[in-house]
């Protein structure tokens, strides 16, 4: 199915997973997911389904009325029986619980926030269609989200990381040396691309050979929600991509169905998000022990550097593919404060 394009294949895969999960729900739940389809991606709907699966599990485990019911026997009218206190109990349950396999699960404030958002959307669907009158989710306050400090690499750490990827195999021996040399150009291209454009790891994984346009020094990416966008790159990214494509990628015969993929695994298949996440984490640990670096942190590093150079929050939002500039502003608010502090020292009222 690779010929359909990576993103279409992923959408089909998520749709099939969603259908399997929906088989565990009461029939009326399928109406909700049908209603979501025009405005959401398959990945989003699958996430909602997993969230609701936890909610129904909670009802069976902790609610006296639902504990004697099979999940498939629940009807839409049963949703009205719950009150705000039940929803609050659910949020408390989410902090730490044992799943159906006995595994301990936890949620931080962001996980709880998302699951309440999913539940509100679920209730709102039936409320708008007048299938229920009582909606207890709207009177429960959303958990407060504390601002997270932006973790990013300093300029010297960026240089050290790229040097490690490009020259770090000198002291390796045996199979480690062979593996390093075989993948060095690919890995350097990935790190340089992430640090030099700020694209998401999912966008990186989804790149095909034909998406690289050296004539205009840009790549075509598929953003969240399936929107196509062009991202421009500079000389360093161009060199890393050219070296990888000309000296490595063109000489690899990809497995059937993966011929179009830009970045291939050692098995000659399209690299996965997890593979790149592990590669970034393992390499970054050798450069900085006190920062947990992920591909998203490389994206934050690029966004920070771009904002420092331009001071243009709208440009940063556009380049990073944020639909709402307030999302960007929220992430880089600390840098705004730093600029304001420096601005306060620029204007002098008396000459010294």
Question: What residue spans do the PLM features occupy?
Answer:
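Conserved catalytic core of the tyrosine transesterase superfamily
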Residues: 1-352
């Amino acid at each position: 199915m690779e010929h359909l394009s990576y993103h279409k294949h992923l959408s089909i895969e998520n749709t099939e997973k969603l259908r399997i999960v929906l088989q565990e729900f009461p029939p009326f739940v399928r109406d909700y997911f049908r209603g979501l389809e025009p405005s959401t991606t398959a990945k989003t709907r699958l996430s909602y389904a997993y969230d609701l699966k936890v909610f129904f599990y909670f009802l069976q485990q902790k609610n006296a009325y639902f504990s004697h019911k099979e999940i498939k026997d629940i009807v839409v009218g049963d949703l009205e029986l719950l009150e705000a206190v039940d929803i609050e109990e659910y949020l408390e349950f989410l902090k730490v619980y044992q799943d159906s396999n006995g595994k301990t699960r936890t949620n931080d404030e962001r996980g709880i926030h998302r699951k309440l958002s999913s539940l509100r959307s679920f209730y709102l669907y039936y409320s708008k269609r007048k299938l229920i009158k009582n909606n207890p989710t709207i009177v429960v306050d959303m958990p407060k989200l504390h601002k997270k400090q932006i973790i990013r690499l300093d300029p010297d750490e960026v240089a050290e990381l790229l040097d490690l990827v490009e020259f770090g195999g000198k002291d390796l021996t045996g199979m480690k040396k062979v593996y390093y040399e075989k993948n060095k150009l690919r890995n350097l291209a990935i790190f340089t691309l992430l640090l030099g454009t700020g694209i998401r790891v999912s966008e990186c994984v989804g790149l095909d050979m034909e998406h690289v346009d050296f004539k205009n020094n840009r790549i075509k990416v598929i953003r969240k929600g399936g929107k196509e966008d062009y991202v421009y790159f500079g000389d360093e990214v161009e060199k890393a991509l050219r070296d990888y494509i000309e000296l490595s990628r063109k000489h690899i015969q990809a497995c059937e169905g993966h011929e179009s993929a830009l970045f291939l695994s050692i098995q000659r298949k399209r690299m996965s998000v997890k593979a790149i996440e592990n590669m970034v984490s393992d390499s970054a640990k050798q450069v900085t022990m006190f920062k947990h670096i992920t591909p998203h942190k490389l994206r934050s590093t690029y966004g920070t550097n771009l904002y420092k150079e331009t001071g243009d929050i709208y440009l940063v939002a556009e380049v990073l593919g944020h639909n709402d500039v307030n999302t960007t502003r929220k992430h880089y608010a600390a840098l705004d404060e730093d600029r304001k502090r420096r601005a306060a020292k620029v204007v002098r009222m008396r000459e010294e």
